[in-house]
Amino acid sequence: MTLIKINKVFMNKNFTTQDEVMNFLADQSIVLSISEDRDAVYEKLMEREEESTTGMMDGFAIPHAKDASIKDADIVIVRLNGKVDWKSLDGEGTDFVIALFIPDSEAGTTHLKFLSQVARLLMHKDVTEGLKQAQSAEEIAELLNQKLEEN
């Protein structure tokens, strides 16, 4: 099964704040037909950040939104040209965002499964280095899909 779609991987974005990234993700939730309510998605992304940071280690963040407006569980990836302050666990800036979108109806199951799979992958240096060195959306999607299938 292909979880990561090439059209949902965005390369070399020039955002300077976490809010710009979250607005982009909310906008894309409409463009990519993930949700029917951009503002609800934005609010859920921000509410989750207020609970505790989704900024992990080594420049990665895993923001996520659970909302009734989200049709199917989905993943959107954004690789930034520079670092953005995300209040990450290691205190470093974030330049690689893996956003999860989960329908309310799947909040307990799909949400936790996606989150744990992605978090586990980011603990492997070969994965994080591969993602950072990838030159195209295709390479990122291929690497993540391969690793997700292995787990």
Q: Where do the model's predicted regions map?
A:
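Cytosolic covalent-transfer regions centered on His/Cys nucleophiles
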Residues: 1-151
